[in-house]
């Protein structure tokens, strides 16, 4: 959306875009597919299982290079994602875990479903002007985007990094978009601040109370990279106070 706003020639609506924040985002699958080493290093798979994941990942990368994005997605889905495949994913079979948004949890917290009823209340419907429209959870949208998921948007991100404030953040406990995978992707972006970012010091970020470490930050120019401690894929759910502090600093800083 941000790239479309940036490149619009005669937009119907003028949007004063100032920046974007990307949280645990699949930006460039080809450089973010190293699940084998990550899962091995956090102890969720052994060396044999890691070897299987590595081989499957290489096949998916080749499909991406060949423009076979749907085939690449099917490997990703069977390996970890588990949204489309009928049987459990390989990750589920070898780890026993149903939840890949936080490696400290084995199952999805029931609290994650509470919002469904809340957003459909009359008060919320009125506040967000949706009338009696049916609430959808996104599954139908995903089904229509299967061929797009494995496509890279790194070239678009590069353009945005040269023109706007950009923050990319990851929860330390996320599996499906793990921090090392994002860091690897960032290292491959060809932008004007790349060399400076390589040498940029990593700074400690404290919680609002100053009593604990919220995470770590690296910043060069208008680009900020953040690792958030004690959080997984769903940062506002795991660490709401820290999430608010982070986004407030980004907007107002």
Describe the role of every protein-language-model region.
Residues 1-253:
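Terminal and linker regions of secretory-pathway proteins
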């Amino acid at each position: 959306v941000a790239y479309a706003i940036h490149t619009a020639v005669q937009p119907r609506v003028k949007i004063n875009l100032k920046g974007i924040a990307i949280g645990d985002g699949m930006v460039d699958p080809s450089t973010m597919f190293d699940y084998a080493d990550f899962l091995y290093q956090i102890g969720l798979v052994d060396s044999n299982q890691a070897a299987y994941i590595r081989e499957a990942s290489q096949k998916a990368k080749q499909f991406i290079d060949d423009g076979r994005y749907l085939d690449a997605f099917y490997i990703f889905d069977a390996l970890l994602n588990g949204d489309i495949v009928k049987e459990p994913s390989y990750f589920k079979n070898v780890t026993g875990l149903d939840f890949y948004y936080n490696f400290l949890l084995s199952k999805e917290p029931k609290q994650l479903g509470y919002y469904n009823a809340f957003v459909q209340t009359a008060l919320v419907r009125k506040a967000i002007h949706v009338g009696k429209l049916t609430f959808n959870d996104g599954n139908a949208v995903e089904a229509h985007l299967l061929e797009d998921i494995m496509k890279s948007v790194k070239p678009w991100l590069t353009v945005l990094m040269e023109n706007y404030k950009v923050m990319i953040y990851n929860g330390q406990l996320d599996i499906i978009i793990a921090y090392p995978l994002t860091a690897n992707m960032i290292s491959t972006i060809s932008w004007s601040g790349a060399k400076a970012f390589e040498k940029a010091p990593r700074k400690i970020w404290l919680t609002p109370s100053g009593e604990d470490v919220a995470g770590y930050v690296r910043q060069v120019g208008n680009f900020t990279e953040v690792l958030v401690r004690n959080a997984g894929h769903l940062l506002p759910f795991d660490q709401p106070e820290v999430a608010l502090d982070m986004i407030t600093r980004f907007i107002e800083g």
